[in-house]
Amino acid sequence: MQNISSDTIQKHPPLSLPFYYGWLVVSLCFLTTLTSAGVRSSPQVLILPLQDEFGWSRALIASAISMNLLLFGVAGPISGYLIDRFGPRKVMMGSLLLLICGVSGTIAMTQFWQFFLVWGIIVGLGAGGVGSVLTATVGNRWFVARRGLALGILGSASSTGQLIFLPFFMAMIAYSGWRIGSMTLIVVALILLPLIFLFMRDDPADIGLEPYGADQTGAGGSAGAASLRG
């Protein structure tokens, strides 16, 4: 009897919302991908400050950025495997933890190999964990109707993250220095972690729901008439 009671409790959404729970899942995934893209692109803004403080050449710094981009791409298949095995929620949290560790290491670094490790490798892998594979998985698991809208929102997260974070990071560096600017990136990621832990779910069935529009026949024809309310 106790097992039945526990299962029943787990089938309820953690929040009572006036709209379909999948839109909250999309929002969390969007914010995570946006933050990841912003952090991943931030080293471009660090080139001049690092040159001035450590005397590293532009080519040397660019080599770490290139490694970051390489691992971001290589991490895609790894991310897909981990999502299949552990679910989007754990992969999102693990990726954010890697980003937090990488940016935190930046604040204490004194040598180039440390910069290469934290930004080139750790941040590159962390950002790759929440790329297009994650957004496609979330969109397809949670939506039948409005799937195109959900995927479109998630697909815009990467470019939006760069659009928001780069000017913000540049302003923080100009007013407070690059270390304080890096700390703001950590704060943003730390805010997201408990939200994902509490409210992110891997699949609609985990909270007793079906994918949005799954109960409609001819979901493709009726998707345009479906509202945001589930």
Give residue spans per PLM region.
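C-terminal ends and interior cores of transmembrane alpha-helices
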Residues: 97-111
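Helix-breaking motifs and short loop linkers at transmembrane-helix boundaries and internal kinks
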Residues: 55, 87, 108-113, 143-144
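Helix-loop-helix hairpin linking two adjacent transmembrane segments in secondary transporters
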Residues: 154-207
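Extracytoplasmic
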Residues: 21-61, 75-79, 166
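Cytosolic juxtamembrane N-terminal segment immediately preceding the first transmembrane helix
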Residues: 2-32, 37, 227-228
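Cytoplasmic helix-loop-helix junction between adjacent transmembrane helices
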Residues: 119-156
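Central cavity-lining transmembrane alpha-helices of secondary-active solute carriers
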Residues: 66-81
